[in-house]
A protein has these predicted regions:
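Residue register within tetratricopeptide repeats
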Residues: 8-11, 52
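Amphipathic alpha-helical segments of tetratricopeptide repeats
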Residues: 15-25, 59-66
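Alpha-helical scaffold segments of alpha-solenoid architecture
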Residues: 34-180, 189, 193, 201
Length: 202
């Protein structure tokens, strides 16, 4: 109950959760109540660094929202897009334009997917004022984008080398030099490759 009280949910929903429990509440609740409950639950998971759980809750919220409910769908889309791009995925351009995310997140997304750390920092700084209106998104990208940047740099190197089975440290270092990125140490490279196993050969 402490979690729900911190989220500031309205009394009727809080009382229902106390009496019935969340799993029994949602199937019989009004749709608007279910949407609000799932959205705040997603935010709680997001701020608790449980991004997989947050993604699932945001997705459930999204599926319950009316197709014409643009403002609420955009609010959810911002979080889902931020989580997606830090995991190497990117929404379509049409999706980002529809919810007006192309101005704030499209170039940031492109920089992460290309593994371009320098461009990412530049775009994040350029959009700091806008993203600070949603401070949690700014901090999330600042703290969680680096692993995705490094992973995508290795993917890019792998593709440039003709998708060979072996990627050498020298190949990755050369790509980093060409892109004017910070030097990658052997320890960093080892961590990147460990995270890369099973994620590139698709």
């Amino acid at each position: 109950m402490f979690k729900l009280k911190r989220l500031g949910l309205f009394p009727s929903l809080l009382t229902s959760v106390q009496v019935l429990g969340a799993e029994k509440l949602l199937p019989r609740a009004r749709k608007s109540d279910s949407v609000q409950f799932l959205y705040y639950r997603a935010l709680y998971e997001f701020h608790g660094q449980k991004f997989k759980e947050a993604w699932d809750r945001f997705k459930e919220t999204w599926n319950l929202l009316h197709l014409q409910d643009w403002s609420h769908r955009r609010r959810v889309a911002v979080y889902m897009t931020a989580i997606a791009i830090c995991h190497g995925k990117c929404p379509t351009r049409d999706f980002m334009m529809k919810y007006k995310l192309d101005g704030d997140l499209k170039t940031i997304s492109d920089s992460i997917l290309s593994g371009n750390s320098k461009l990412f920092k530049k775009e994040l700084d350029n959009r700091a004022d806008v993203l600070h209106n949603s401070l949690n998104i700014y901090v999330f990208l600042l703290l969680n984008a680096q692993p995705a940047l490094q992973l995508n740099l290795v993917k890019r190197t792998w593709k440039l080398t003709g998708k060979s089975k072996i990627i050498t440290f020298e190949q990755i270092r050369k790509v980093a030099e060409c892109m004017n990125l910070m030097e990658i140490t052997k320890d960093q490279l080892e961590c990147i490759l460990i995270n890369l196993i099973g994620k590139v050969l698709y």
